[in-house]
Amino acid sequence: MSALRRDLDDYLVIRRALGFKLERAGLLLADFVAHLEANETDPITTDAALAWATLPPNGASDWWAQRLAVVRSFARHLHAIDPTHEVPPPGLLPGRSHRATPYLYSDSDIAALMAAARGLRSPLRAATFETLVGLLAVTGLRIGEALRLDRDDVDLVDGVLVIRLSKFGKSREVPLHPSTVDALAAYTRERDRLCRRPVDRAFFVSTAGTRLLYCNAHLAWLDLVRRAGLQPRSVTCRPRPHDLRHSFAVRTLLGWYPDGADVHARMPLLSTYLGHVHPGNTYWYLSAAPELLTLVVARLDATVGAPA
């Protein structure tokens, strides 16, 4: 093992101990180190970093910028230990940050998705995806969090989900509405009736009795969207599973404003419920829907007075 590869292993261990998963970054950096080894380059140089970051030659500039950003973080770590490693300066490969426009689901959209799930040929598959869609809609869970749920993580007595080692390695408890508990209990009975010999302890199972894989769940989602007749609203606004999370947050905020609630004081509660590390990530939802912006402006006008 080369010194650079050992350095990479140490870097990933340290960063992951701090809560960063670095799944994609770990793969990219392993490829970067392999590139340096193949070209017998050590220490890291800006030229070598640029040469690797701009692969493939016909790649998108945004992708090149992301690749270089991953290298810069690793290079900063090494430079602090050994100053012979160069840190590529920022701005060498400027890329634009494209944040997808949230597809905010209406109640009828969610009902259409659940109806589409009920129409699936396999009774187990139908029950699984109808319940999964409903759970994402009423809790704002990340789809990966829902797929990783074990049976022991779903407490139907106290009405609580235990989300273990989610994004940034955080765990949390998510309280459930009684109607959600009833729906999960109904799925549990149906799942156990249709799948008498599950392969593992997953709460949501495939027709083979195994835990649902994200890639398969994503393909199933695309099928449900098609069956439900949901259409993209723009090139950057397509119905994605993660947008159920956006929709939950926006609906929660929309419910607070008419009640006259102190939204700023309640934001940390929503952040904790959603599993956000930084409240700023939750504040982003204020700009996610025109209805929210209208309510924010109205609240400001009522507080400081409308302009003359």
Residue ranges and their predicted role:
Residues 1-308:
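Conserved catalytic core of the tyrosine transesterase superfamily
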